[in-house]
C-alpha cells in the first residue's frame, strides 16, 4: 500500500464489453493501530477477498458459486498495539464478468473498527509501504 494511492477505488474488472487484463490484485504494506485494543476488519467485496495480518489469514469472503454478489464480512477481533507496525496483505480475485447488458465495476474495500475507532477506511497515516519498497 502506498500512502498516496487510494486503496478503496473500484477495480477495472472484466466485462463482456471490455476485457481487462487484471483479474486478481494483491496489496502489501504495513498497518499501525492508534490504540492498544481489539480491532475488527471489514471487507466489502463483490467477488473474493483475503486479508492477512502478519501472514495470518484473518478474513476471507468467497464468491457465491463463483458469481459476484456485493456483501460485507467481518473478521474476529484482532488485538493490536498502538504504534506498532504489522504487515497487511489484501488479495482480491475477480471470478467472472457480469451478464451482457449489465455494466458493473469490481468493488473491494477494507475498513476497520474498534472500541475507540468508528468503522471506516483505514487512514493513510496508519498505512505505509512494506520494507524494501521500491528497491
Regions found by a protein language model. Name each.
Residues 1-40, 44-135:
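Extracellular/secretory pathway-exposed regions associated with glycan biology
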Amino acid at each position: 500500500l502506498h500512502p498516496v494511492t487510494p486503496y478503496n477505488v473500484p477495480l477495472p474488472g472484466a466485462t463482456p464489453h471490455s476485457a481487462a487484463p487484471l483479474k486478481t490484485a494483491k496489496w502489501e504494506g504495513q498497518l499501525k493501530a492508534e490504540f492498544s485494543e481489539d480491532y475488527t476488519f471489514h471487507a466489502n467485496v463483490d467477488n473474493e477477498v483475503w486479508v492477512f495480518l502478519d501472514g495470518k489469514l484473518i478474513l476471507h469472503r468467497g464468491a457465491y458459486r463463483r458469481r459476484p454478489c456485493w456483501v460485507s464480512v467481518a473478521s474476529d477481533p484482532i488485538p493490536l498495539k498502538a504504534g506498532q507496525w504489522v504487515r497487511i496483505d489484501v488479495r482480491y480475485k475477480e471470478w467472472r464478468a457480469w451478464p451482457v447488458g449489465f455494466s458493473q465495476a469490481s468493488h473491494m474495500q477494507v475498513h476497520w473498527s474498534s472500541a475507540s475507532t468508528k468503522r471506516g477506511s483505514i487512514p493513510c497515516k496508519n498505512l505505509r509501504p512494506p520494507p524494501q519498497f521500491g528497491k
